[in-house]
Amino acid sequence: MAKEFGRPQRVAQEMQKEIALILQREIKDPRLGMMTTVSGVEMSRDLAYAKVYVTFLNDKDEDAVKAGIKALQEASGFIRSLLGKAMRLRIVPELTFFYDNSLVEGMRMSNLVTSVVKHDEERRVNPDDSKED
């Protein structure tokens, strides 16, 4: 029977917390002037590689997002060394940062659903207007 919540998931969960603290307290890069949130971490089975998914507070500006991801990639060695001090791991994983747009997409989908529901209710209240379309 396979473990539902194995070691890679537990390490990823703890690593997410530690990276969030490191980004909040230790990283002083001006390109990361916007608030950075670690939305998830995926670990390889051998714990040698980690995909770190981040979101930014000001994610409307695509250039700022690209600059933020680039800054995180350049600081990944420093983050990795701090992570090695904070967590007891035999191998500190190689970090790769990705922008997580699921929050933005979720907001967009929610707005679409809200507008469709609003439009539907307007048509229900004024059925004469819909016949003219």
UniProtKB/Swiss-Prot annotation:
One of its GO terms (molecular function) is ribosomal small subunit binding. Pfam families: RBFA. It comes from the Bacteria. GO terms for cellular component: cytosol. Disruption phenotype: Severe growth defect at 26 and 30 degrees Celsius, with poor growth at 37 and 42 degrees; has decreased amounts of 70S ribosomes and polysomes and increased amounts of 30S and 50S subunits. Results in a constitutive induction of the cold-shock response; increased cold-shock and ribosomal protein synthesis continues in the presence of general translation inhibition. Less efficient processing of 5' end of 16S rRNA, increased levels of precursor 17S rRNA; effect is more pronounced in cold-shocked cells. Residues 109-133 are annotated as: Required for stable 30S ribosomal association in vitro. GO terms for biological process: DNA damage response; maturation of SSU-rRNA; response to cold; ribosomal small subunit biogenesis; ribosome biogenesis. SUPFAM superfamilies: Ribosome-binding factor A, RbfA. Its main location: cytoplasm. PANTHER family: RIBOSOME-BINDING FACTOR A, CHLOROPLASTIC-RELATED. Belongs to the RbfA family. The C-terminus (residues 109-133) is required for stable association with the 30S ribosomal subunit in vitro. This is 30S ribosome-binding factor. It comes from Escherichia coli (strain K12).
